[in-house]
């Protein structure tokens, strides 16, 4: 699996791995790179089955597989210890990494993560799946910002959102891969073993997030 590694800003700089959500694209983190690269060697990547890591995913594809293939790619790149920042699905992959490779993960930052999918989040994805089946990739992509951003924020950034829509559509991962990654997200359940995570964990959430209620982060905090 291909990784994008920034040059270390100094000798033995710590490594931070950025894991995006269901879209799978490493470009999700572009706004943060300039700041992070001043202090860290930053690893971004397109998740398997997306972007520059194309593949056909198995029907039983899982969060554990996502974590394993990322860890193997990091080891192959000579990276033994790393911090993880994960958003949504990426936070789930980060928790799996912390559980399966505790000697490697130094710290975990969970952004809008959860223990297991909330009923509200499941409902949102059901609506989006119907859009995918009825309107195809374009309907899925165009609806995505409505589940992510406040209306005022979107209204003030219409050209940016149109450009992001065009990019997402051009690099759409395909319906089958998307649904298999989504099913992996739905099946994930850390409610019985999150307390086994031993590295420091920082939890970040948005109080006005439409897709993931902030209560999910509170539940995660309590479980840790």
From Swiss-Prot:
It holds the Pfam family Abhydrolase_1. The keyword Hydrolase applies. One of its GO terms (biological process) is nitrogen utilization. GO terms for cellular component: membrane. Belongs to the AB hydrolase superfamily. Hydrolase RutD family. Involved in pyrimidine catabolism. May facilitate the hydrolysis of carbamate, a reaction that can also occur spontaneously. The keyword Hydrolase applies. Keywords: Hydrolase. HAMAP family: RutD (MF_00832). This is Putative carbamate hydrolase RutD. It catalyses: carbamate + 2 H(+) = NH4(+) + CO2. Its EC number is 3.5.1.-. One of its GO terms (molecular function) is monoacylglycerol lipase activity. Residues 14-115 form the AB hydrolase-1 domain.
């Amino acid at each position: 699996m291909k990784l994008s590694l920034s040059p270390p800003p100094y000798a033995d700089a710590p490594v931070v791995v950025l894991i995006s959500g269901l879209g799978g694209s490493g470009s999700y983190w572009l706004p943060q790179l300039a700041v992070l690269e001043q202090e860290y060697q930053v690893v971004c990547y397109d998740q398997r089955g997306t972007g520059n890591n194309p593949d056909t995913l198995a029907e039983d594809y899982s969060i554990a597989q996502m974590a394993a293939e990322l860890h193997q790619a990091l080891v192959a790149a000579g990276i033994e210890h790393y911090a993880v920042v994960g958003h949504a699905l990426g936070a789930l992959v980060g928790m799996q990494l912390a559980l399966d490779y505790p000697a490697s993960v130094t710290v975990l930052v969970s952004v809008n993560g959860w223990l297991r999918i909330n009923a509200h989040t499941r409902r949102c994805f059901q609506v989006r799946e119907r859009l995918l089946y009825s309107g195809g990739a374009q309907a899925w992509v165009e609806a995505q910002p409505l589940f992510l951003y406040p209306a005022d924020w979107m209204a003030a950034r219409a050209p940016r959102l149109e450009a992001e829509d065009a990019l997402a559509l051009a690099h759409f991962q395909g319906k089958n891969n998307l649904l298999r990654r989504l099913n992996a997200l739905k099946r994930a359940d850390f409610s019985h073993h999150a307390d086994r995570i031993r590295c420091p964990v920082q939890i970040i959430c948005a109080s006005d997030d439409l897709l993931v209620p902030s209560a999910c982060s509170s539940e995660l905090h309590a479980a840790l």
